[in-house]
Amino acid sequence: MGTGYRTQALYIGSTPDPARRLAQHNGLCKGGARRTADEKRRPWEMVMVVEGFMSKIAALQFEWAWQHPAATRHLTADAPSKEQSKTHEGIEDDDAVKKPQQKTKGLTDSRATGEREDDGKKKTKRKPPARRTRTSLKAHLEDLHLLLRSTYFKEWPLSLRFFAADVSQQWRWLCGRVNESIPTHIKMVADGNCADTSPQCDHSLGVGSVREIGVDYTPIRDYLEKATFLLDDMRGSYCKICKEQYVDNDWAVVCPEADCTSTTHLLCLSRTFLDATEDPERLVPLTGKCPTCAQTVQWPLMMKELSIRTRGGRLLHNMLKKGGKRTRTIQKAQDATAESDDNASAADIAVDASHEDSDDTDSLIDYWDRILGSDSESGASIHSQYGSKASGTEVNIEKNVFLDNGLLD
């Protein structure tokens, strides 16, 4: 919103860095937009932010639809069309325009044929999008309300962040007037100088100002390190849902809970979350319960981690380099656990060996007396005893093999 001495001007744009973009609009750094370059409209103020888009393309789609409500296919125009709003005078003007067109009948056949050929060669130019006819703040908020309720955008994990109290108040007034409400998962955050105490607004997610909006991936660095460490070598790991081992180039996701190491196929988890919603029209889930820890996790957060891990490139390398100390700590903890398990196994082997070596301490005479003096019943019991011991060892070996292959927890 431009707050210069002229009438307040409104501008809708898209940016990955709100603080930098606001400085560009105010001429503090290179960049900006042509419509915000007028010094008489400066300084510009960012009154609200729609955030939570899954990609840059998604943000641009929403931006274009909000800028061109009369042309977008996501909105139904409330205003009557030109054909319905024509006055009697306008109809007469159209008839007057049509009359000269009848003179073309007097053209020669050759001239008419030439014009038709020229028209066939000309390429049809794409019409520019219809301009916005309403430019007030109220009109912009009404269009935003319609977009958030549209079939295409209502399933997106978006949130509204208000930095101006008057804009937040007008939005609440609009929501109270409209019969239909926006989806409940779309959050409203009262930030900046907003003193909104309504239950719809969340103050806990406030950052204070536009400059404090986080634009990097620092909040999910620990989550990214854990996922990269768990899926570094996918051989031997398996999906917690379908119980199948991963193969190369499998899309796997990791539970964002700090104490959970659950990994699943992307499609397996998506199908599980969608089945739990019982909504056949939903294509992308929003939340769901982890199959291992049963905690409710956010699908957009998991997709953000997956995108950085698979397409981050240098960004991923730098984040993991900064977090290398924590990764080494995790590795040491796992090594210590493995070492303790090895020590326990070695102790068990030593105990078994001590029992077996106890027979070697007997003298040769005692040994032959015990063997020759034993009857068939005692021999049968000895055979049964050693047979059961061998069976138990075999079961333990099979269990260890399954653990190595990742088939058991």
From Swiss-Prot:
One cellular-component annotation, GO: Slx1-Slx4 complex
Q: What spans are recorded as compositionally biased (Basic residues)? A: 122-135
Which Pfam families does its entry note? Answer: GIY-YIG, SLX1_C
Q: HAMAP family attached here? A: Endonuc_su_Slx1 (MF_03100)
Q: Which GO terms describe its biological process?
A: double-strand break repair via homologous recombination
Indicate what this protein is called per its UniProt record: Structure-specific endonuclease subunit slx1
The molecular function terms of the Gene Ontology recorded here are: 5'-flap endonuclease activity; crossover junction DNA endonuclease activity; zinc ion binding
What this chain does, per the entry, is described as:
Catalytic subunit of the slx1-slx4 structure-specific endonuclease that resolves DNA secondary structures generated during DNA repair and recombination. Has endonuclease activity towards branched DNA substrates, introducing single-strand cuts in duplex DNA close to junctions with ss-DNA.
